[in-house]
Amino acid sequence: ARKIAETFNTVVVVLTDAALATSQQPFKRPQFNEAWLAPPVDQSAVPAGAKPYDWDATTGIARRFIPGQPGGMHTITGLAHDRQSHVAYDQDINQEGLRARSLKIAALQKTLLPPEVIGDAEGDLLVIGWGSSKGAIEEAAAALRAEGKKVSSAHLRYLQPMQPGIKEIMQRFKKVITIETNYSDNPDDE
């Protein structure tokens, strides 16, 4: 999450669920991977005249000014702002900010890989899920494959932007089921 936030200068929201948050199980220590690291933070002095939101026209990404960085004084708010970081209520400035955010998401999507399909690349049924449903889905799909059924599974790691190739993967199966384990209301509670 930090690597995405630092690389694309954007907010990242990590979604989880109660089962994942409260479950306990042993796991193998992961092998360190350099690809997990965020790029180093540029703390050099900001060039004279540089604007804190000088968005790149193709990626929407601007150099990140670090608090306390020489020449990097600017305002940070959740409101629409111009390239100099002044709050602005002008529709053109708002549109420019929206476009920059959209370009950042598009740039991120270009770095994502399609979700891995567990089982055959095509078949009768594809079961898709995210979060803690992964283990149950893979276990059920494996049991059905052991019975000779053409069932595969896929696990989504990104919801916005979506990983590329999902539509093409889904088209290779006769049926697709998505699993959502969000239901937790008491059925007797009206």
Task: State the predicted function of each range.
Residues 3-190:
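Flexible, low-complexity linker and terminal segments
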